[in-house]
Each structure stands twice: as structure tokens, then as C-alpha cells.
Amino acid sequence: MPTTYAHDLFGKEVYKRLPSDMKALIRRHGDLYRIGLHGPDILFYYMVSKNPVTQFGIEMHHEKARAFFEEGMRQVRRNDDEALFAYLLGFGCHYILDSACHPYVNKMAAEGVIPHIVLEKEFDRVLMEETCLLYTSDAADEE
């Protein structure tokens, strides 16, 4: 169900609840956190034609996330890479929100109630209306 705005909003809400040291890390690497919030969806934005970049994003949505996060955290620890950690924190937000919402979205799409992408876009539209786009500043700029 979540798409661009929902993932961004969720990441900002998560950020507010993080301990101060994690907020500081995200402020230092805010762009990477925000990119991570979109997970593999960011690969869908290259829409010149049917292409391997978009296909890779689709495939990532069907893969188990555990191996991705384990390898990412191995790299964080091995290289003391806080920039990668900020990205993984954002990607983790993406994964959590998708995991919570996609069972419902997939059910509605399978039953022919509403196409997957239409439901996601409508959810974003409703969130924008409900928040009146109050969340205009970036999570990394808050505090």
C-alpha cells in the first residue's frame, strides 16, 4: 500500500522516536536515510521503457530481506560505515511499512477490488490530504 509519500512520512515518524545518537547519525547522512526509505521502489522511477533496472526492483520485492540486511550490517561493522548504516535504517523503515501493508494490498488486488498501484497511489493521496502536507521539512533537518 505505501508508495513515495507514505514511505517518507513513515521515515519521519520513526526518526522522531529514535534515540538521540541515531538521530545525529541520520542528520549526518540524511540523504542516504531518505533514499533508503524508498527501498527498491527507487528502481521503479526509471521508466524510459521496460528495462532491467525496474525488473530488478520488482525482483527485490519478492526476495527475503534477511540476507540483504545481514550483509549490509556485516559491511557496516567491517568498515565502520555509518553512512551505510543510515541507508539501512531508512531501508528498514521501507521494509517494515511494506511488510505491514502489502498483505492487504495484495489481497485487494487479487480479489479485483482495485489494482495494486492504484491503491498505493490513492493511499498516498489520502495521507497527503490528512496531513495537509504538514511534513514539509526533512527528517534530517528536524530536532
What do the PLM-derived regions correspond to, one by one?
Residues 11, 98, 140:
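Alpha-helical and His/Cys-centered functional microenvironments
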Residues 93, 97, 101:
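Short active-site segment of divalent metal-dependent hydrolases/proteases
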Residues 135-143:
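Conserved small/polar residues in nucleotide/adenosyl-binding loops
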Residues 85-93:
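Short alpha-helix carrying the canonical HExxH Zn2+-binding catalytic motif
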Residues 1-86, 104-134:
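N-terminal, motif-rich segments that launch catalysis or mediate targeting to/interaction with membranes
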